[in-house]
A protein has these predicted regions:
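Polybasic "coupling" helices that flank or enter modular domains
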Residues: 178-246
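Short glycine-rich, low-complexity segments
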Residues: 3, 15-19, 27
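Cyclic-nucleotide recognition modules
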Residues: 131-196
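Cyclic nucleotide-binding regulatory module and flanking cytosolic helices
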Residues: 42-94, 138-139, 144-146
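Cyclic nucleotide-binding regulatory domains
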Residues: 96-158
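Phosphate-/nucleic-acid-contacting segments
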Residues: 219-295
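Short hydrophobic alpha-helical segments enriched in small aliphatic residues
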Residues: 6, 30-32, 39
Length: 295
């Protein structure tokens, strides 16, 4: 497996130096050659050659981006443009640091599979998870302009991320105003979720925090088709939950047992089953309005 380096664009298959997107977005004028490159790239995606950006079954890596957001979801043309412009798709191992705090970055990542978190830590090693990203989320669009992050980006379990160089994001934004708006919207949605996380830590008690987080994750995963019948996979450990909710592992264990005994929720073997959605939402004071789902 190629070592992941978020500080530079990843280039395998059709990368930034030889891909379709360069001919269309970066000012080259040999349109005949561009057409041949595009056709060749389309052929390879169709037969799913390893190293290109289509998923098995012909699904696009960006297919979940803004899914569930109604009219804000990308058109097929916009989605195809975004798909053709990705630098690379990277498979990453569990607990792999994808971006280190303070290090220069020149690319951003869209989660394709799995879960990725952003975390901050003290010098003594205490860790706080400050966000959790699911398939369809851009993890670090703020790095597009800031050029470094004030937190680490870490995969929770095995995951796949689609890498976009910042040059490509700039070209896409210039070429397609709707894509520029979608990147902005993605950042606004992140900010809304961050505010909800601040509220959760600042005003909710332990059981309420756990209930609120599980309600949020269920709602977000349901929007992208990854939660069915109030059940979903979640590779978080009790230690991870503690890092996200500022609770000890012992406290998390106690709360999960209480929720299970009250018939609200079961979390075991990395699977979540919500038995009473209405009661769990009431316990966590959960209002999904901040997720801006399609109505």
């Amino acid at each position: 497996m190629q070592k992941f380096d978020a500080g530079r664009p990843q280039m395998t298959g059709f990368g930034r130096k030889q891909g379709v997107c360069d001919w269309n977005l970066d000012g080259h004028h040999d349109h005949a050659l561009a057409s041949r490159v595009y056709a060749f790239g389309f052929f390879h995606r169709t037969i799913q050659i390893v190293g290109l950006t289509s998923l098995p079954g012909g699904k696009m890596n960006s297919s979940k981006f803004l899914t569930g957001r109604g009219r804000e979801r990308l058109t097929l043309e916009e989605q195809t443009l975004l798909e053709d412009s990705s630098s690379n798709v990277q498979a990453v191992k569990a607990r792999e640091t994808l971006v280190r705090r303070g290090k220069p970055v020149c690319s951003s990542m869209l989660v394709t599979e799995g879960f990725v978190c952003r975390s901050a830590s003290k010098h003594r090693g205490q860790r706080q998870m400050v966000s959790l990203h699911i398939p369809g989320d851009f993890v670090d669009l703020d790095g597009f302009k800031l050029k470094r992050l004030d937190n680490d980006v870490v995969s929770i379990g095995p995951a796949k991320v689609t890498v976009y160089s910042h040059d490509t994001l700039a070209s896409l934004s210039e070429r397609c105003s709707r894509l520029a708006e979608s990147f902005w919207l993605s950042s606004l949605l992140d900010a809304a979720i961050h505010r909800a996380w601040i509220f959760r830590l600042g005003r909710l008690e332990a059981e309420e925090r756990v209930a609120h987080l599980f309600c949020e994750l269920h709602a977000r995963l349901e929007m992208v088709g990854l939660a069915q019948n109030a059940s979903f996979g979640l590779p978080l450990t009790q230690s991870d939950l503690g890092a996200a909710l500022s609770l000890t592992g012992v406290h998390i264990n106690r709360v999960l047992r209480s929720l299970r005994e009250r018939g609200l929720l079961t979390f075991q073997s990395r699977q979540v089953k919500i038995h009473d959605r209405k009661a769990l939402a009431k316990l966590g004071d959960f209002d999904p309005a901040y997720l801006y789902a399609a109505t």
